[in-house]
Amino acid sequence: MTEAAEEPAPPTIGVDLGATNVRGGVVDRSGSILAELRDHTGDDGADVIPTTAALVGRLRTDFPAVAAVGVGAAGLVDRDGDVQYAPNIPAFRRTPLREELGNAIGLPVVVDNDANAAAWGEIVHGAARGALYALMVTLGSGIGGGIVARGRVIRGAHGFAAEVGHFQIDPNGPMCACGEPGHWEAFASGHALGRMGREWAAAGRAPGVLARAGGDVEAVTGVHVGDSAQGGEADGRALLDEYAELVAVGLAGLANILDPERIVISGGLVELGDTLLAPVRAAFARRIEGSAYRPRIDIVPAALGEQAGVIGAAARARDLEPGESGVWTK
């Protein structure tokens, strides 16, 4: 008698919820995205839940067997799936996102911090796969983080761990978007690189970068700096090297505390490849304690790119047992 073939696990939907955009995808057990949609939300985030519910509904039209939905949301997400605070989404203040979205779509929903979701995606399907202890750092408009130890995302007592962009490295430094001065995010985010580019251009130190912005100092962004550095222009390279030092300051501090075996860097700046990562690795080696006497900590680019959050959130949803509420306990 031949045993019946085991039915494939139903797909899940992963949602990456940002300040002004929502992206969702149907993801199978292998981490492949079968369908993907995105939509815009209002600046204040008041329409995030109905917009997300509508997007999930459109995805389910072609994939009615979807079993659950995972959401990676910006901000402080607690164990109940409530977003307590999101600095870039004014409407997210003590918002019961898991409950309200679940009621709107009629499926089990699990909600996690967006950086944690991306970290989980890289652990399960990406560049951190096989690492027992890993640190995920996202260099975007801000800086996000995820910590993995022995195959589990570390969330802390309240779910707010790994807000790595918000440790202070200079109390007299530039103002962070959260309203406090001198946070690592204010020095080493993608927005910070753009600010550095404008400062250098205004001081006459970055003519190549300025030319790429059409000669308009206020138009200079991190993209112009990266293009200049990749083009071999001395000013772009020097500026990016200084930025790499600031990235390494934070990475070395985190590594001294957490002792990961691998650090995965994600975000748009990773597209610069070794133009950015080589000076980051060199500066990191100079700054971490006992560099010559400790095992090497690999610093690698993320493998999943901007899809890490969707894939990781879907993987979190796949871990839900039938009938489980979506409140995470590990």
Where are these regions (language model features)?
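ATP-binding/phosphotransfer module of carbohydrate and carboxylate kinases, centering on a glycine-rich
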Residues: M1-A68, D78-D80, R98-L107, G121-A131, ...
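Short beta-strand scaffold segments in enzyme catalytic cores
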Residues: V22-V26, G75-L76, I143-V148
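A short acidic/small-residue loop/turn micro-motif
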Residues: H40-D43, A91, A161-E163
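A charged helix-plus-loop insertion that forms the helical arch/lid used to bind
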Residues: V83-R93
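General beta-strand structural signal in soluble alpha/beta enzymes
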Residues: V109-N113
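Active-site glycine-centered loops adjacent to acidic/histidine catalytic or metal-binding residues
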Residues: D114, G140, A313
